[in-house]
């Protein structure tokens, strides 16, 4: 059974409230905080309003791509539960974790086995390892068989072009599953019906 799900790319209060009020809210909700190329990007000013809600038992995740110090200082003020870091070296990741006293999701973008093996450099630093496809906002998948070499005990999450119909195949794996694009309509907006389907499916 999967550990739970992360719904990523939330950018409006209506969708956020709907998710948090669901009978089976997700373990994580992700917000794109500094990658302005993404259609899901949320500015700092909007985040201050958006995050002023009762999180209940859901972890709020700030998704960052090699963030500058001023960005990290802003994120600190928003009291996120996790920072999800792309393109951040182990040494800097450790510094961020120690300085800000926050849990870390290290995001590794995967094409081949060498990319997967990068997780070893973050052992003892990262709290969760996210294995994602290349492309950031483009949601590109990768061969999940590449993860067969990863210890089952590793706290891991999988993302990258995962569809709702893919969820059942993960049901025997001790992982978190991260979805974004699969929960959107043709206009690129989150579809609450698809979100409901996901949360009900995971909690059958």
Annotate each predicted stretch with a short phrase.
Residues 1-204:
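Conserved N-terminal beta1-alpha1 strand-loop-helix module at the mouth
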């Amino acid at each position: 059974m999967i550990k739970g799900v992360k719904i990523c790319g939330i950018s409006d209060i209506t969708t956020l409230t709907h998710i948090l009020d669901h009978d089976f809210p997700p373990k994580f909700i992700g917000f794109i905080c500094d990658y302005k190329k993404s259609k899901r990007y949320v500015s700092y000013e909007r985040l201050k309003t958006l995050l002023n809600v009762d999180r209940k038992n859901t972890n709020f995740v700030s998704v960052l791509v090699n963030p500058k110090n001023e960005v990290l200082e802003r994120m600190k003020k928003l009291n996120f539960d996790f920072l999800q870091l792309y393109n951040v070296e182990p040494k800097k990741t450790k510094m961020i974790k120690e300085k800000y006293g926050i849990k870390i999701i290290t995001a590794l973008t995967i094409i081949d086995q060498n990319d997967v093996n990068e997780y070893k450099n973050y052992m003892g630093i990262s709290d969760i390892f996210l294995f994602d496809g290349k492309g950031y906002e483009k949601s590109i998948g990768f061969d999940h068989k590449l993860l067969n070499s990863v210890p089952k005990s590793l706290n891991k999450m999988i993302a990258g072009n995962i569809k709702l119909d893919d969820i059942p195949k993960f049901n025997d794996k001790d992982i978190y599953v991260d979805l974004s694009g699969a929960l959107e309509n043709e206009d690129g907006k989150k579809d609450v019906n698809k979100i409901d389907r996901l949360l009900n499916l995971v909690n059958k």
